[in-house]
Amino acid sequence: MSRRSSRLQAKQHAQPNQPDSPQETQIIQAKKRKTAQDVKKRKEEITKKHQYEIRNCWPPVLSGGISPCIIIETPHKEIGTSDFSRFTNYRFKNLFINPSPLPDLSWACSQEVWQNMLQKENRYVHDKHFQVLHSDLEPQMRSILLDWLLEVCEVYTLHRETFYLAQDFFDRFMLTQKDVNKNMLQLIGITSLFIASKLEEIYAPKLQEFAYVTDGACSEVDILKMELNILKALKWELCPVTVISWLNLFLQVDAVKDVPKVLLPQYSQETFIQIAQLLDLCILAIDSLEFQYRILAAAALCHFTSIEVVKKASGLEWDDISECVDWMVPFVSVVKSVSPVKLKTFKKIPMEDRHNIQTHTNYLALLNEVNYVNIYRKGGQLSPVCNGGIMTPPKSTEKPPGKH
């Protein structure tokens, strides 16, 4: 037996149980009454607080400035659930209700890979309204800059993914800044491409080459300083799932038949570059930032295939992409009105990888055509492009009889 137990037993034998004295009983009862009164008093105070609200004591005319307030007594109000239906942009999105369209993978869980991609899509935010933050900029300035970056990518045989990473870095960086001078756009753009090339390219161009293509507008020191600014502003979040990555994935999911070959492109390179050209043109328009990259890629795929293919490859329904599909109609009309883009061959680039090299065409002229189509659409008319391409006279064999 422990020493403590021995002491307790000895104490109990030395002091036998005795009934409480009347004085001690009165003290205990008084304490109980006091405690009950305190609890009741606190409840009354809480109830009283709920019966008061703050009301502006000045007329509505003066409510624009700082207004004194008074506290008035009001009837008790039940706290009701607010209507959150108007806060659509801030609702929690349950990513787990989207089943993975990916096939079974030998190297990872397809559902986990899919959920990770969706989480990235929601974490890397872009917004077409970033131009509101920059009073000195106009929408076409972004288009001109991105068109120039496309040309630089083609000259240095950079991959499409490199361009789309640079585009994402630029748009997200501009969303973190305010009142950027238009003279800084080229520096921000070329620095974004510099960062993207180091991430994506095996043999990235040297720093002096990026400075060279700016024709003296940006020095190597300027690019290095801006690189650090961009990385800090983006908090080193440099791994978005780009538009072109989604397109690659969707075409692969639709075409793959054999699981062991899932990592090798199984789709048509010609189909890929046709859709990629459409996305190149779309991304020049600042309104494209209104849509998630996954939606843009799925809408472009829908224009060249069918909604059934989109459902199979992306897991998206028509309601998810219908708005983007409609927005993309003028772009599709313009792209299909010109000669189809052809696969190019590049030195030191394997044939199986040539479709991934970024190419450039006169995108600014095509974008002007898109603007024309939009003007006609708003006026309720169909432009010549929307009517099926550029209008040309019929062949002599197709003319009506008697009009030769």
From Swiss-Prot:
A GO BP entry: regulation of protein localization
One Pfam family matching this protein: Cyclin_C
Positions bearing N6-lactoyllysine: K348
Keyword Ligase set for record: no
Compositional bias annotation for Polar residues: 7-28
Keyword Cell cycle included in the entry's annotation: yes
Positions bearing Phosphothreonine: T392
PTM annotation: Phosphorylation by CDK2 triggers its release from CDK2 and degradation via the ubiquitin proteasome pathway. Lactylated at Lys-348. Delactylated by SIRT3.
Cellular component GO terms held in the UniProt record: cyclin E2-CDK2 complex; nucleus
Cited SUPFAM superfamilies: Cyclin-like
Top-level taxon of origin: Eukaryota
PROSITE patterns: CYCLINS
Residue positions where Phosphoserine is found in the record: S21, S383
Broad class of where this protein is predominantly found: nucleus
Subunit text: Interacts with the CDK2 (in vivo) and CDK3 (in vitro) protein kinases to form a serine/threonine kinase holoenzyme complex. The cyclin subunit imparts substrate specificity to the complex.
Function: Essential for the control of the cell cycle at the late G1 and early S phase.
Family: Belongs to the cyclin family. Cyclin E subfamily.
PANTHER family: CYCLINS
Protein name, UniProt field: G1/S-specific cyclin-E2
UniProt gene name: Ccne2
